[in-house]
C-alpha cells in the first residue's frame, strides 16, 4: 500500500462493482498511470450501503499484475494478429467438433457468449456437477417467485435469521455484517420500549449487554457468526437438511417425531414468534440442492 500512495486529486475515478462474491458491492476505483491505486465504497442503499469488506477494498493487486494478462494474441506459440485469430477460430468452429470450457472467474456475459459460439451441448461451465445442480436450483427459486429474495438492507432490518449450511463470512462478508446487525434488532426494540433512542449508542449498549436476537447458525464447522448467534448447531449436511425438513413440517402444521431435532426446530420457531421479519440464508457451499429447496420453502411459509 505504501508504494501505491497517491494524492486523491491525482487519481482518476470510475464507478465499478466488486467481483469477489455474489453480493456485488458498489465501488469507486481510483487509477493513476494505468494502475489501480485505491478502491473506495460507492454508496448504494439497497446493496452495500456505506460499507465494503477488506477483501473488496484491498484485494485489487491482481488487476495490476501484467504477468497473468494476455498481452499478445497467439496461435500455438506464434504471435498472431486479431484477424488471424478470428480466421482460425472461424475454421475451428465451422467443423462442428469444438468444445468450450468456461470459467467461474469470468463474467456471466463472457461465459454466455462462449456458450453461444459452440452450443449448449459443447459447453462446460468449469464447476463440479453438484455445484452446477445447486446453482440451477437457486435459479429455479428465483424464477418461481415463491420465496422473496431479500436485499442486504432488508436482511439488516430482519429480527430473526437462520443460516443453513453456509459460512457467510467466507462466501459473502458484507452479508455477514448485515446478519450481525440483524442480530441486534430485537434487543434494540426492547431498549426503545423504555425510550432509549437508537442513536444513543452507549446507553443502548449498556441496556442490551450480551442480549442477542434469534440468530441461528447450522454448519458442520465453527463460523465467525457463532459468537453473535443465540444458538449454533454443529451438524452434517444431512442433519442440517433434516432440521430444515422439520421446520417445514412444523410450519405446515404437521406432526413431527419427538426428539432432539424436533426440539431444536420448535425452539427456533418459538424465538421467532414475535419477530416482525425473518431472513433465511443458504448457499452452495455444502452442494446440497435439497437444502436450498427447503430453505426457499421455509422462507415461503414464513411469508404467508
List each language-model region with its residue ranges:
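Catalytic alpha/large subunits of respiratory electron-transfer oxidoreductases
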Residues: 1-304
Amino acid at each position: 500500500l505504501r508504494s501505491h500512495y497517491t494524492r486523491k486529486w491525482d487519481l482518476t475515478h470510475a464507478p465499478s462493482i466488486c467481483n469477489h462474491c455474489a453480493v456485488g458491492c458498489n465501488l469507486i476505483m481510483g487509477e493513476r498511470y494505468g494502475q489501480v491505486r485505491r478502491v473506495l465504497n460507492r454508496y448504494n442503499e439497497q446493496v452495500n450501503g456505506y460499507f465494503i469488506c477488506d477483501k473488496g477494498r484491498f484485494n485489487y493487486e491482481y488487476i495490476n499484475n501484467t504477468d497473468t494478462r494476455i498481452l499478445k494474441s497467439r496461435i500455438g506459440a506464434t504471435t498472431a494478429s486479431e484477424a488471424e485469430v478470428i480466421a482460425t477460430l472461424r475454421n475451428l468452429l465451422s467443423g462442428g467438433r469444438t468444445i468450450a470450457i468456461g470459467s467461474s472467474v469470468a463474467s456471466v456475459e463472457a461465459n454466455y457468449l462462449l456458450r453461444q459460439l459452440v452450443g449448449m451441448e459443447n459447453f462446460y461451465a468449469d464447476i463440479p456437477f453438484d455445484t452446477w445442480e445447486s446453482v440451477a436450483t437457486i435459479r429455479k427459486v428465483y424464477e418461481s417467485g415463491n420465496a422473496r429474495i431479500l436485499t442486504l438492507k432488508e436482511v439488516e432490518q430482519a429480527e430473526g435469521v437462520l443460516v443453513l449450511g453456509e459460512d457467510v463470512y467466507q462466501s459473502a462478508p458484507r452479508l455477514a455484517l448485515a446478519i450481525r446487525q440483524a442480530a441486534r434488532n430485537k434487543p434494540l426494540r426492547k431498549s426503545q420500549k423504555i425510550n432509549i433512542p437508537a442513536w444513543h449508542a452507549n446507553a443502548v449498549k449498556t441496556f442490551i449487554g450480551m442480549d442477542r436476537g434469534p440468530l441461528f447458525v447450522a454448519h458442520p464447522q465453527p463460523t465467525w457468526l457463532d459468537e453473535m448467534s443465540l444458538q449454533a448447531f454443529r451438524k452434517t449436511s444431512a442433519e442440517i437438511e433434516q432440521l430444515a425438513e422439520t421446520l417445514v413440517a412444523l410450519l405446515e402444521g404437521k406432526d413431527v417425531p419427538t426428539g432432539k431435532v424436533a426440539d431444536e426446530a420448535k425452539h427456533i420457531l418459538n424465538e421467532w414468534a414475535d419477530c416482525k421479519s425473518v431472513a433465511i440464508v443458504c448457499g452452495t457451499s455444502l452442494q446440497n440442492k435439497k437444502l436450498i429447496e427447503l430453505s426457499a420453502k421455509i422462507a415461503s411459509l414464513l411469508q404467508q
